[in-house]
Amino acid sequence: LHGIHECRSDKFGDTMNPQFSSWLECYEPFMDEVYSAAKQLSEDGQLSPEIVSAMSRARDKFQNIFSQPVYDACLIHGDLNVGNIMVGKGLRITGFIDPLNSMYADREYDLFQFNNLTGKRFFLCDTYLKKYGASEKAEQKLAFYALWNEVYCFVKAGTLIPFIMNPLVK
């Protein structure tokens, strides 16, 4: 993973045409779009008000959570979880599959899903952050990314996975 993150661009955004000068300039429109869609789905009775409330509380803290600038536009997988890691003989990582939302971004964006499914059990996020460093508010950023990603998936696919979403809205 670190090898992927070592691929850099001078701009943030889509791998084919990164065009944003900062990570927040890239991420905030996505954040606003997902939040607006979530509010509408909640008003229509399709999304729990508790989820939108958690999003509102997180959004109120956005400037604080993301106060430390991201200087490096790193290539990220965008959907990295334990199910997308290919492992060969001797438990050697042989590849990654399903690079949904691959882009030049905050490298920590790639880490939030390591705390989903069974990923936390393997200490993948903790190991990466200890080895390569973490931003000052990495834990809060990862929770923010996770919440927005799960709601984004609901907006696109219409399905929530309770054992992933429930810890995010507490």
Locations of regions flagged by a protein language model:
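An alpha-helical support segment within catalytic cores of ATP-dependent transferases
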Residues: G3-G78, G88
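Short, surface-exposed, charge-dense and proline/glycine-enriched linear segments
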Residues: S36-S53, G78-G83, N101-R107, V155-L160, ...
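Active-site Asp-x-Gly
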Residues: D72-I76, N81-Q140
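Hydrophobic recognition helices of helix-based DNA-binding modules
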Residues: L1-R8, E150, F154
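Alpha-helix N-cap/helix-start and coil->helix boundary motif
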Residues: N17-L24, E28, V82, N101, ...
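Helix-rich C-terminal or lid/interface subdomains of diverse kinases
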Residues: D32-Y35, F112-K170
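Residues that line or immediately flank small-molecule/substrate-binding pockets and catalytic motifs
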Residues: R8, K89, L100, A146-N149
